[in-house]
Amino acid sequence: MTVPFKIPISDLDYCLEQLLDHKPPKILPPETIQQLCHTLKTELLQTPNIISLQSPISVVGDIHGQYHDLLEIFQIGGSPPQTNYLFLGDYVDRGYYSVETISLLLVLKLRYPERVFLIRGNHESRTITTNYGFYTEVLNKYQGSADVWTFITDLFDYLPLGATIDGKIFACHGGLSPSCQQLDQIRAVDRFREIPHDGIMADLVWSDPDVAISDFKLSPRGAGYLFGNDVIDKFCQDNNLVQMIRAHQLCNEGYTSYWKGKCLTVWSAPNYCYRCGNKASVLEILHSNYDSKDPTNGSDGEISSINGEFIGVNTSFESFGDDDDDYNDYRNRFNNSSRLHKQQGVLPGQFFNVFEASKENDEDTLQGKSVNGINFDDELSTSDDTSGSGGNNNKGDFFAAFFQERPKRQQVEYFL
């Protein structure tokens, strides 16, 4: 592969402008997406299967083409580069705006490479996207051409399979594998290919936790496994971990905690498929300063509340200096929160932003749109739109400036 030149920041900001300043968002031309994918593939060639990240960081679960709800995530949790993000996969399929969603994430990854991190889910696959909407959406939006689908699904082969946070938390899309006991086994996998039907790579994106079992059990999904408490206990012990964070499963409240927080599921697509009515969440990890080897056995931070109203929280921030710019944004949002609720037996320094569907999600639902019934004229319109912030001249940080101009939306926060 020929190493492409580095895409200028001004060009990336122009792509952001096209996606953010128009309603509906403008789709990027095929040649632009090809260049984005080509550049990012070259960079990801040097990226290990498991990326090592540090807190503070926000963890995002499945998005599934719900573009406006992705914007809601940035509105609630802060936009890059002020906030670090780890996305756990399943960016496309089922939602109406898979093209726009993955396009925005690719641009953000190139624009803020040390702030935005993407790993692979089970829908980052040629087979799955052919059957669950993304392929058809590309054909509809690009006059019958599948080129954009090819560019993006080729890129999917390069995405990492997991991440560690502070060396203590393991994050992946799905779950654990009976073929893998050590993180080094994941690091040794050849990931630059389509997701196979079985083996470590498949299990990482397909498996699910199950509180009713202790060991492994074949998954009813037809791929991956169900895994129980003994499995995750041993995996964490063998790899000096305290927790696993994953996505992959719809949660009505936006998240699910298993085994006193040893395993968390984060779900970030509200009103999934525009009919489920579920909430969504983003997990913010402020720190992982745990005193005990297994902090899930107790709580280091004590929350006081009466009838759900926040009174005070005994969580130490003194270990982070006031000059720690990376941490200040997280700390300020935490201290300014007014609706925190107690959760039993989970790790300190973590909380969920729980939110409901954006008004654009509601509008799409009322219009009865479907992946195979997109309004082509609206999607491909090139007419000028003055409703956005097209006059913004802050090209130094277009993305952050876009969200500074939007009103803050109310969110519900659950402390962990």
UniProtKB/Swiss-Prot annotation:
Give the cofactor binding note: Binds 2 manganese ions per subunit.
One Gene Ontology molecular-function label: hydrolase activity, hydrolyzing O-glycosyl compounds
Cofactor(s) this protein cannot do without: Mn(2+)
Question: What is the active site of this protein?
Answer: H123
Q: What is the effect of changing H248A?
A: Abolishes catalytic activity
Return the annotated region ranges for Disordered.
363-391
Task: Tell me which residues bind Mn(2+) 2.
Answer: D90, N122, H173, H248
For this UniProt record, give its keywords in alphabetical order, as a comma-separated list.
Hydrolase, Manganese, Metal-binding
State what this protein does: Serine/threonine-protein phosphatase that plays an important role in controlling colony morphology, filament extension and agar invasion. Down-regulates expression of NRG1 and affects the expression of multiple filament-specific transcripts in response to serum and 37 degrees Celsius. Plays a crucial role in virulence in a mouse model of systemic candidiasis.
Name of the protein: Serine/threonine-protein phosphatase PP2A-like PPG1
Whichever gene encodes this chain, its name is: PPG1
